[in-house]
Curated annotation (Swiss-Prot):
Its main location: secreted. It is found in: Secreted. The active site is at residues 5, 41. This is Dermonecrotic toxin LvSicTox-alphaIC1bv.
Amino acid sequence: WIMGHMVNNIKQIDEFVNLGSNAIETDVSFDKKANPEYTYHGTPCDCGRDCLRWEYFNDFVKALRTATTPGNSKYDKLFLVVFDLKTGSLYDYQASEAGTKLAKNLLQHYRNNGNNGGRAYIILSIPNLKHFKLITGFQQTLKGEGHAELLDKVGYDFSGNDDIGDVQKIYEKAGVTGHVWQSDGITNCLLRGFTRINAAVANRDSANGIINKVYYWTVDKRQTTRDTLDANVDGIMTNYPDITVEILNEDAYKTKFRIATYEDNPWETFKE
């Protein structure tokens, strides 16, 4: 999965897909009442990027729905969306409410109330383990609205670079048993080692691990891309999807990896 990083403006959806992204990551900021408000990152952000691009959340999600509905030219090119949920502005007790409001919003504006809406898989990426009730609030809301089947298209990620064992315990608390992606990484302005990504891959590949897929961010340089592929990840989050595509076509990688398609299930652990 080639995950276009910080796609917060409607025009950027096309831009990143045209460069080779089959997935995008979008930042979601919340208002004081825990409503998803903007697709916005703000400063500071990755080196070489404009941190201030934004849309109203509802507008972005409607445009995303159009792009990921059968009949659109991007439909079979873009099929995974990571919502990077900026819950740091919320009190811990608001996490469940944020999940409820996000679910209602996506049900209406993205899934079109289950009536031929957007078809992409969605990952809820949460920066704080304490906010695990966002997941339960989200799940209970979709079930309560009579759309439990839409949870088949929803996965989860904790993005705070916490200890993998702690992450697994929180999933147990939240009752999550699958659809788990694990991110690791740091802004492209800094270097980060592979110790934790290796631990995440080991959990993914162990019999009793909870992780299904692992991705690393933000991978922009050619050598870092090679090192990341050598760590056996499933996804690369990048500001330059075309560089990821270029490296995947190198002799060392083109027989070992392939770019994911709409037919690939992002919740299935890949077994060699």
